[in-house]
Amino acid sequence: MSTPLQGIKVLDFTGVQSGPSCTQMLAWFGADVIKIERPGVGDVTRHQLRDIPDIDALYFTMLNSNKRSIELNTKTAEGKEVMEKLIREADILVENFHPGAIDHMGFTWEHIQEINPRLIFGSIKGFDECSPYVNVKAYENVAQAAGGAASTTGFWDGPPLVSAAALGDSNTGMHLLIGLLAALLHREKTGRGQRVTMSMQDAVLNLCRVKLRDQQRLDKLGYLEEYPQYPNGTFGDAVPRGGNAGGGGQPGWILKCKGWETDPNAYIYFTIQEQNWENTCKAIGKPDWITDPAYSTAHARQPHIFDIFAEIEKYTVTIDKHEAVAYLTQFDIPCAPVLSMKEISLDPSLRQSGSVVEVEQPLRGKYLTVGCPMKFSAFTPDIKAAPLLGEHTAAVLQELGYSDDEIAAMKQNHAI
């Protein structure tokens, strides 16, 4: 089966989550991704949050499937020579080291262009080069704080909150992936590679665009009618935290379901659509609300939206969350159960679709990983296990033309 990126070679100089999530997707699309790791150590996530002693952690295995791993010491002359040969044959190089790290290895963008003018150089940093925070070390929650997510997440009477979703890390990797694929297409037209940079702050901000929309509306109006603070609360000069509100034109909230007293996830998310208000009233046994002026329009409902949700919750709290969703769906009401990670890991539909995949790695054995979220009609990504540290060092060096004796000498000289 042919794959979209078959024949594309990627040098993966990334670690932790933002870079590996990008290069893993390239590997799923068929690229030959060579993960370059420090001899004897490897990606730091191999050792972080281990569940089995002395075995690659799930943190690593779930972000590095389908790749090849080589151990290479680029501080040695032999290591630099290998690196130059790899660059000469590669299509893409991706890195997410601290600013200047690749330059200090002797591989500036200018030098890389001299070696291989067709190479596409992908780079992830916490902040853009023109940012006052350019030298700040960035991780997931740092990016969420600086990108506008934290200030707009949480409840109005509490502190800013960070999201459990990897808005700063994996999201940045997905944004860079888009840029790299665009650069590959551009190379088909120009014959030359280019540098693609992605800041974690920018990636978070791109997902917070509706909050930038709301800031401009707030500046003009002094209020935001879809937020729970309207009309009885107060608005400051910045977009407030809205709790579980929908954030768009459709009010929504988390509602209790049967068993909530002991099950922390016995809830559903319920959305009220203006165009579906009549069905909503019928579903919750409030047909009089359809024509009642206090409820018949979104503008009329907003002042007592929490009273409305409390009334709806009187129904949802009597039934299981899955039963609630099944019932409400008959009335075309947008809703979903709050699914725990335990439920997601056991969901047969996610296994069937390939969204959750079981793979097997030597030493670790079988484990679950997230599969490719995109579903293609012409091919299905074959999700394979993450590589062991240095598993493919000899094979990659042989492909570059090194003999067994030369490889043995490099090992003795601590170049690999």
UniProtKB/Swiss-Prot annotation:
Source taxon at top rank: Bacteria
Record-level GO BP terms: oxalate catabolic process
Keywords: Transferase
Chain residues that bind substrate: 248-250
Matching InterPro entries: CoA-transferase_III_domain, CoA-Trfase_fam_III, CoA-Trfase_III_dom3_sf, CoA-Trfase_III_dom_1_sf, Formyl_CoA_transfer
Signal sequence range: none
GO molecular function, one term: formyl-CoA transferase activity
EC number: 2.8.3.16
Pathway membership: Metabolic intermediate degradation; oxalate degradation; CO(2) and formate from oxalate: step 1/2
Pfam families, per database record: CoA_transf_3
UniProt keyword Transferase, yes or no: yes
Reported function: Involved in the catabolism of oxalate and in the adapatation to low pH via the induction of the oxalate-dependent acid tolerance response (ATR). Catalyzes the transfer of the CoA moiety from formyl-CoA to oxalate.
Similarity section: Belongs to the CoA-transferase III family. Frc subfamily.
HAMAP family per UniProt: Formyl_CoA_transfer
Record's protein name: Formyl-CoA:oxalate CoA-transferase
Organism encoding this protein: Shigella dysenteriae serotype 1 (strain Sd197)
